[in-house]
């Protein structure tokens, strides 16, 4: 919309000189005119014809064509004998300008000027001054609109950050809202206009601290404040990079075995092939430094795969200032992945305590900037944005933190004191920042943004509630309590500050317009539009006084004559004889009777509404009946407080039911292409010129509509309750009050409407849950073979020949292999077997096992977070409405309460998520997860004796140099938990899936080792073969997940269907969401057209034989090829080993879900969401690099995928030139993508 208007707002093409195209731009007004001609004298047909203009929008191009406007007004003139079309004709300038919009096509200010000229020519000639008392006077509206257009043009051309202020009736125009939104968009694009004070830069004690702030500010092109140390120049940036590399870089080695403070800034992480667990944030930091260093030194940037990660030591960790807490993402990432680089726990805990305190202070500053404001405040929004940006938190950083926290298992937060509190504050701040910066670019006092802000606020409330619920039910083990994990409270209120985006509805402007409308029906439809646009209740209608407001003595004589002419009994008989939806013309003799309102309410509104709510009528007839109740006799009936109060909620019921059946009409500021809707085609669904498009159009033919709002069913229930009160008052005042049956409403229509709204959501979420469970079962089966082999590998001492560099791995004897599954007895073998390999191959196997296990744990944690996000996005709004329905006071007047059963689906999804968290925790506690860092850490430590020590021993030096003290022998514990040694199947599996050198180079038939010493250095001292022993973990079986997942997948009937059996002795609820096939049959029976049947297609899971094909396309699946190239053998039957505790529960069952930001997604999942919910807006379909890389299991593309995962670095040349163009959305800028030369 902005680009469309900008195309006409600048240069020589703007203003009145820009001529609109001669061809028809949009068929909206033409179709309405045709429908009006076909309606004749039927008031219900006239209402149906004008409904798109009452509730929707159309393109400005129609108003710029004199022929379309002339035909529309001439058609209204033919019907000017009726009150409703006469009122539209009288206020036609307001009526047409209110629904005109820029967003339907690429319209600009030139089209607006042409439309105003056409409307000015359509006004009747008058000698009165335009400054009349009528606020809806056409001349005044056109003059006000021209002034607004000129003001808009000035604001955009000056670019001073001003916004368009609107009041009066023009504030209700759709295109005026779009002009206002465009000025706010320009304001936020240029934010921040003033320099930011990066206090972390001035407080930094090290070059690294200043570098991190500089990279953040320069990459996002944020202006620096004049005060303080000042903005670094390009030379300063290069000098910092050179100092970091040449004076602080150190050696690219290290690990947990290093001494405190003995390493440099760059280290090689333990996991290199893993995409998520290889510290991508730390690697990005290193790439930024080395990239600028390469440019400064005239070299080439090294490949990303060869770049070490940015690390830390005790000395540097102490020097990191708390004021830059949000710049140290690489530190938090390393700690959450157990990478300490030898830093003592006391230093880590002191660092975390300082960071937690600083984040609490930042949250307090955000709260102070937001203040106690409860409505839209641009000044408060700018203050909060300044606080967040100055602290180093924008949308990109918040997304990085959200992804990091979602990919790390929950139990990883329990290692150090203050780590849980720090992670909770990071999670809360990043979640708030994501909501804030996603709302910021479009923030404006418009109806479209009001709906977006309300939805975001409710979603943030649901997220905060889920976080509190899972935090209170988190781990409370003694170990967790010892480090202060279980006592962490909600860090701060991250929801209330978002109220600065809540836009109050312009009730005063609508009141002013409604007071000047001459038709009660037109006034009621105005408030229906208000309720729909702003999602706010309309004020109570102004009730006319009794007797009816007819002028003077003539009115009283007419009322007395009507009473005398038509007795009450005749009026009641007439109302009984009417057929709702079929009687077109009203008899004035009866309709103008003062007895007509009560009789019409009792004998038509009550029974007709009962038939509609019982779903006895097809959809078209139900809508026709509601439309008839609203419009019948409205032009002839005397003003009546009862009938006015009864018809207002009926209009709302009609509009809302129409929304749910056919979708909501487009609203101001929304484009069908932008929100995933089909383009406007008011000529019907068929081809152009189809004969059926004119006469036989059904209700849904008018429609480019989208989905209805989340509270649509609740709005219908509120309206029915309001009508119930009016009917009760009317009946109690009649003579038949004692004979009247009790007022009770059926629930069939509510059941069907709720089904229409949430059947697709329930089916898609149920299918995603079943896929998630099957993916977990597949992963547990695949990874259990790897973890079982790792557990058996470390269960026996390994013999190492120092001269040949060969390692002898004990193998299970034939008797042991036969007894693996049968019994757990010790099998005595007189001929032990060994498998020989070299030490480097063993290291590769150990590293590969840890990499695969960590990668699987990280990918499964992301899959679990995806499922939790899907639940929160799809199910939480439905649960809010279903709970509101269940507790609605309308059920006091119904035959049986409506009990939506979405709680059952919610319980199933939550149970599946608990299983997912338990699997993540089990993977992290397995032996394989820390196979290199802990179990075989000795292999990667410096040698126990080096060349200098050996030379000292040979020369009999009296003072030999010190040596590293060898690790004590850690022999495995015996007993029932001791596994058998490795089998040949395990060797073959590890060789094919982890390290091919294990089986391709060496002999596959090893012989027993020599019993003689391997090497004799002197006759006096022999060195026996060194035994590499490790401490195995306690075994455990993760069969609980597989069994539960299998039961959930194959034995449970999908929730929310009529096929679900009710418990014995319990009456099934009267309302259940129907399965797709039954829903399709109901929709066909109710006359739903083909374009709407797509929303109810069968989403049931594929047959059992097709699950593999389904899983192959699922982003949640982990195929066996990710871990093995062969079928499972004997070793594959073992469950996940090395997990303390039993089953898949325990501490892992309390894993807390972590939501990933919405823009971190996969294209495959985006396509599936679009397939499951074709009428919903699709999320961003561009997958993040990390998700694309993590989707694959390995192979030749792993290096390339890993290269794309690392974010780009700061270009020193670009920083030096400082001419990089400023991107739009100043508060949501992202770092530039690397060019081909950079890579």
From Swiss-Prot:
Recorded hits in InterPro entries, A to Z, give: Herpes_U30, HSV_ITP
Q: Is Oxidoreductase one of the keywords?
A: no
Q: Which GO terms describe its biological process?
A: virion assembly
Q: Where is the composition biased (Gly residues)?
A: 1139-1148
* Compartment(s): Virion tegument; Host cytoplasm; Host nucleus; Host Golgi apparatus, Host trans-Golgi network
- Say which domain of life the source belongs to: Viruses
Q: Which GO terms describe its cellular component?
A: host cell Golgi apparatus; host cell nucleus; viral tegument
**Location of the region described as Disordered in the Swiss-Prot/TrEMBL record:** 1-20, 669-704, 959-980, 1087-1239
The residue ranges flagged as biased composition, category Basic residues, are 1219-1232
Q: Where is the composition biased (Low complexity)?
A: 1112-1123, 1180-1189
Location of the region described as Interaction with large tegument protein in the Swiss-Prot/TrEMBL record:
615-1239
Q: Which residues cross the membrane?
A: none
Similarity field: Belongs to the herpesviridae inner tegument protein family.
Protein name (database record): Inner tegument protein
